[in-house]
Design a protein with these regions (language model features):
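Mid-chain, well-packed structural core segment of small domains
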Residues: 62-104
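Rossmann-fold NAD(P)-binding glycine/threonine-rich loop
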Residues: 102-130
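NAD(P)-binding Rossmann-fold cofactor-contacting core
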Residues: 22-30, 34-54
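Conserved beta-strand elements of the Class I
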Residues: 17-19
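A short helix->loop->beta-strand "cap" motif at the edges of active sites that frequently abuts
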Residues: 39-41, 93-98, 116-118
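Short N-terminal or domain-adjacent regulatory/targeting segments
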Residues: 1-12
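Short, charged, surface-exposed secondary-structure boundary motifs
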Residues: 53-56, 69, 108-111, 129-134
Length: 134
């Protein structure tokens, strides 16, 4: 994806579900989500356990997020082999973008998301891209 497309996406998207976020402050998923929240994005933590992270209610899956909440970006902090079911949930949930963080690469899942009409960013850090482009 080209820089101008990412910049436009980051400018118009406001709600980011962070799948695989850690409650540990030294983990990249936590620091990225904290940064995005500090920049005005609404963060929705998604992980199998926990109650709150960064002052936000933790949901155990994308499907658990109330349907009236529009998810713009699904930011994935999971191993590459764990990506396909997350992408399927993102598609069914009506997300606009699937963002796979640095080191998270799954071309087949990315292609599936694109076929469903989602934009896909793969193997890039959303925080670094925001700092660079915004």
């Amino acid at each position: 994806m080209k820089d101008d497309e990412i910049k436009s996406m980051l400018g118009r998207c406001k709600t980011i579900a962070v799948v695989g976020i850690s409650p540990k402050e030294d983990r990249p998923s936590y620091t990225v989500a904290s940064y995005l929240k500090s920049k005005g994005y609404t963060i929705i933590p998604v992980r199998p356990d926990g109650e709150t992270i960064l002052g936000e209610k933790v949901y155990h899956s994308l499907q658990e997020i109330p349907p009236e909440v529009n998810i713009d970006i699904v930011d994935i902090f999971r191993r590459s082999e764990d990506v396909p079911p997350v992408v399927e949930e993102a598609i069914h949930r009506g997300a606009k973008v699937v963002w796979m963080q640095e080191g998270v690469i799954h071309p087949e899942a990315g292609a599936s998301a694109e076929r469903a009409g989602l934009q896909v960013v793969m193997d890039r850090c959303i925080k670094k891209e925001h700092q660079r482009l915004m």
